[in-house]
Amino acid sequence: MPVFQYQVRRPEEIYALSMELAQHFPDPSTVQIGIYELLLNALEHGNLAICERLKIELVRQYRWQEEVERRLQLPQYRDRHVDVVLELEGTACCIIITDQGDGFDWQHYMTPGNRTRDRLSGLGLLMVRHAGFDAISFNEKGNQVRCSVAK
């Protein structure tokens, strides 16, 4: 089984990696947005500890990028990276994304009806649920997600 490993640390690395990873899946255009959102969530919420409430405020004030750049320089965050593993099994393509944060309550966000339409945050995981993955699972801590698609 071929296994490929990657790391990302900055937002500008995420799009290119999501495009590259998606090419290994049967329907790249469908899974690419899900991969992108998972990588972005791992970086901003996991590694940089930007909570949902703060993200909403930063987006409304057009200061999200500024805050991400500021946190990337802070001692407690500057050495963090997101680990990505792509496994090409005989019958499935699988991606495993792990951040170095404290994790989150993924059950809340993956349960239909727990998100309201007027919220600016939580949309990424909602998109992931509809991104063409056959299976999505999180570790107990909530800092690792595994998504797979049958070949």
Q: Where does each model-flagged region fall?
A:
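Residue-level signal for the start and early helices of compact helical domains
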Residues: 22, 39, 73, 95, ...
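Bergerat-fold GHKL ATPase/HATPase_c domain
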Residues: 1-40, 44-61, 65-74, 85-87
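Glycine-rich/acidic phosphate-handling loop/turn and adjacent ATP-lid/helix
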Residues: 53-122
